[in-house]
Amino acid sequence: MCIRDSFGNVLGSNGSVIPLFKEQLENGGPLTVTHPDITRYFMTIPEAAQLVVQAGGLAKGGEIFVLNMGEPVKILSLAEKLIKLSGFEPYVDIDIQFTGLRPGEKLYEELVLQSEKDDIHKTQNDKIYVTSPGDIDDEKLISHIEKIRSMKPGDSREFLMELVPTYTPDREA
């Protein structure tokens, strides 16, 4: 059985922005933000674990499960609040620098595709929503998986870029 859990950013996990900001604060700044308007959804580690467990229990196969994480958070506001909570004044004591969006990065997170939004509805748990993916050609999918398995490690990136036009790798593998 195959399901997909659609996550926001998991607070406190590796790669989460909070530990990065804390490290940058400890070093005297600046805090780096990719774009002044960028927003992201957040969930805690226990929420992420519950989403996986409950989605597994609710799944029939092929669904997409999404946790209601409330409103997206503006990363710039998060940086400014963290600076203030640390006893500093943003842009006076600790600067914030904008680094620019990375390849493939979006200003606004999309937890489900537009085509998946039409069918989204609550589950028995009010914080978990479920939807169905768009039509998938199973034979074509299996063919693509077999092709990827037979490729040399460096060749799969080009193939993925053909399959997913919005996929933009940020560095060479």
Residue ranges of model-derived segments:
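Strand-loop microenvironment adjacent to phosphate/nucleotide-handling motifs in alpha/beta enzyme folds
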Residues: 4-173
